[in-house]
From Swiss-Prot:
It holds the Pfam family TIM. Signal peptide: none annotated. It comes from Saccharomyces cerevisiae (strain ATCC 204508 / S288c). This is Triosephosphate isomerase. The gene is TPI1. The lineage of its organism: Eukaryota, Fungi, Dikarya, Ascomycota, Saccharomycotina. Present with 207000 molecules/cell in log phase SD medium.
């Protein structure tokens, strides 16, 4: 079964009503293939607004984070039910910025993933190594450790999309070569096949998330295990449409 091309746009802590309106209107008027799934993830403040603007069936809205409780005294957090209530369908979990700046460890991310899936949203699960880990030859050790934590909690990965984001490439302008990305993605899929079975692993989408942009996205076109992109800064710019159309 062919895996549907998936492009996530992580706006991070960027955007205003005006800029988000411009981004969504650009998507609404762009020529986008029917066989692509696009998820834009604005700051939580603008989730409701973004949902109201989207007109393309290929485009849905996701959150950048969610807590692992449905409600309660958790100041500053957003629950999965609240995200769903405003029409968002996905949530990004495990992003390297959450791991490093907010000290979210593998177990916490695994628990959040299990909870979010149980509440009925899709999860874009981020994994990846730092520059130090890459230099030490530990890339696969790191991503397998991160995946193992989630595998202990989640048995059905139907609504999970994995995003491999080499931390050393995020926001630096550096990017893994398409060949390197393919090798790592293939290794991730092989590892997941050993845990979930060949069928589940073959259906799972694995995104590349390291400084993908309108210029380099097309170079990944023929890489069998690169099923799309999780885009950061470029998702705020017109080139986001070029990334979405990079498989045409």
């Amino acid at each position: 079964m062919a895996r549907t091309f998936f492009v996530g746009g992580n706006f991070k802590l960027n955007g205003s009503k005006q800029s988000i309106k411009e981004i969504v209107e650009r998507l609404n008027t762009a020529s986008i293939p029917e066989n692509v799934e696009v998820v834009i993830c604005p700051p939580a403040t603008y989730l409701d607004y973004s949902v109201s603007l989207v007109k393309k069936p290929q485009v849905t809205v996701g959150a950048q984070n969610a807590y692992l409780k449905a409600s309660g005294a958790f100041t500053g957090e957003n629950s999965v039910d609240q995200i769903k209530d405003v029409g968002a369908k996905w949530v990004i979990l495990g992003h390297s910025e959450r791991r490093s700046y907010f000290h979210e460890d593998d177990k916490f991310i695994a628990d959040k993933t299990k909870f979010a899936l149980g509440q009925g949203v899709g999860v874009i699960l981020c994994i990846g190594e730092t520059l130090e880990e890459k230099k030490a030859g530990k890339t696969l050790d790191v991503v397998e450790r991160q995946l193992n934590a989630v595998l202990e909690e989640v048995k059905d990965w139907t609504n999970v999309v994995v995003a491999y984001e080499p931390v050393w490439a995020i926001g630096t302008g550096l990017a893994a070569t398409p060949e390197d990305a393919q090798d790592i993605h293939a290794s991730i899929r092989k590892f997941l096949a050993s845990k979930l079975g060949d069928k589940a692993a073959s259906e799972l989408r694995i995104l590349y998330g390291g400084s993908a942009n309108g210029s380099n996205a097309v170079t990944f076109k023929d890489k069998a295990d690169v099923d799309g992109f999780l885009v950061g800064g470029a998702s705020l710019k017109p080139e986001f449409v070029d990334i979405i159309n990079s498989r045409n």
